[in-house]
């Protein structure tokens, strides 16, 4: 797990920019809905979807295979925690539930830092748009996702 202090300033700046980008686009209901649909119906990682779209905005190339390998462990932890949080919801006060959500956001941010670190170590040669299409696996879904993001950024 990467803590904030482990990232050199340049990488921390990229991680912070990515986090703010994610907050901005994910706060749009249509983007959130589409991301969650891809997560729930097609087991796609929301952070990776957002990262690939962020990389596309930056005109960066990526190595999708290595990105997937890098986040595999953190994705399992996040998924397990998310299931636990959802199962516990009926048994918790609103304050307790909000604490679990806050912890989940910390896990999400750490996963984003892993993506940034992996990108800097292994930038790859695949355009981010091609990687996004490959990752989503369905051209029409990828096009719709990109269209939704584009509208959210305007």
PLM features per residue range, with description:
Residues 90-154:
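A charged, amphipathic interaction segment
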Residues 15-18, 44-48, 93, 97, ...:
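Short runs of predominantly hydrophobic/aromatic residues within well-ordered alpha helices
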Residues 2, 16-29:
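Acidic, glycine/proline-rich low-complexity segments that act as flexible tails and inter-domain linkers
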Residues 30-68:
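N-terminal interaction modules that seed assembly of large macromolecular complexes
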Residues 6-16, 32, 41:
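N-terminal leader/targeting segments
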Residues 36-37, 61-76, 126-130, 151:
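Short alpha-helical "patches" and their helix-cap loops
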Residues 1-13, 151-154:
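Short, low-complexity, intrinsically disordered N-terminal peptides in bacterial proteins
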Residues 2-6, 63-119:
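Aromatic-anchored, charged helix-turn/loop surface patch used as a conserved interaction hotspot
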């Amino acid at each position: 797990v990467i803590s904030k202090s482990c990232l050199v300033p340049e990488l921390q700046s990229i991680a912070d920019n990515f986090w703010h980008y994610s907050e901005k686009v994910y706060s749009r209901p249509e983007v959130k809905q589409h991301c969650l649909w891809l997560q729930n119906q097609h087991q796609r990682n929301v952070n990776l979807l957002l990262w690939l779209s962020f990389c596309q905005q930056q005109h960066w190339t990526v190595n999708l295979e290595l990105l997937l390998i890098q986040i595999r462990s953190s994705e399992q932890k996040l998924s397990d925690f998310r299931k636990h949080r959802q199962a516990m919801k009926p048994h918790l006060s609103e304050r307790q539930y909000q604490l679990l959500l806050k912890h989940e956001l910390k896990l999400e941010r750490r996963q984003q830092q892993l993506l940034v670190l992996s990108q800097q170590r292994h930038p790859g040669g695949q355009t981010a748009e091609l990687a996004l299409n490959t990752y989503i696996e369905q051209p029409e879904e990828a096009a719709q996702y990109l269209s939704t993001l584009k509208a959210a950024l305007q």
